[in-house]
A protein has these predicted regions:
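A detector for small-residue-rich transmembrane helices and their helix-helix packing motifs
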Residues: 1-192
Length: 192
């Protein structure tokens, strides 16, 4: 296996392992950990901005998110581990804040906002950078997960707010990433 790939896969499988262990504990505790999920406009629920993506309502919920997360996470990790971590932190925090501000009442849990954020990141990179590699990855993301567009629409029992906020934040991060690359490129040109 290529040396650069192994640490990236370890990161991805490590994240998945944490989610599975938390789900095991949560299911054994009657899903009592979900009280730490995100509850819109409740000050005491602000920690849910960071905790909600790690908690799930059922094993089916977890594995539904985890399968897509592993694929889209692997595609996003092709850029770099550091960029994946920065993008993930931005997506988790920014989408969580948006859901806290604008979400419907109730407890929001699950990694789908993060998942949609990675999807938005891949599509955004293709839109803003237009490199062959980014276009190829976005085409693959659309081919595999084109149905995500339906997840952006309101549905009963589904936090479409997290889906929408995640996708928007992933695209926004991609636009900032592009802007940073342009600034670095201009700086190198001036110093040349």
């Amino acid at each position: 296996m290529t040396l650069w790939l192994l640490p990236r896969l370890k990161l991805l499988f490590g994240i998945a392992a944490v989610m599975v262990v938390l789900q095991l504990i949560n299911s054994l505790e009657g899903y009592s950990l979900n009280r730490f999920g995100l509850i819109p406009r409740e000050l005491q629920a602000l920690p849910g901005v960071l905790l909600a993506p790690w908690l799930h309502g059922s094993w089916l919920h977890l594995f539904g998110n985890l399968s897509g997360f592993m694929v889209l996470g692997a595609l996003a990790l092709l850029e770099s581990r550091g960029e994946f971590i920065r993008a993930s932190l931005f997506i988790i925090v920014a989408s969580g804040v948006l859901v806290w501000l604008f979400g419907r009442p109730g407890i929001h849990v699950g990694s789908s906002g993060w998942l949609f954020g990675l999807w938005g990141l891949l599509l955004g990179r293709a839109w803003f950078r237009r490199s062959f590699a980014d276009l190829l990855l976005a085409a693959l993301a659309l081919l595999l997960y084109g149905g995500f567009f339906y997840g952006l629409l309101p549905q009963q029992g589904v936090s479409f707010e997290y889906h929408l906020a995640g996708a928007l934040c992933g695209g926004l991060y991609a636009s900032w990433q592009r802007g940073g690359q342009k600034r670095r490129s201009r700086k190198r040109t001036r110093q040349g």
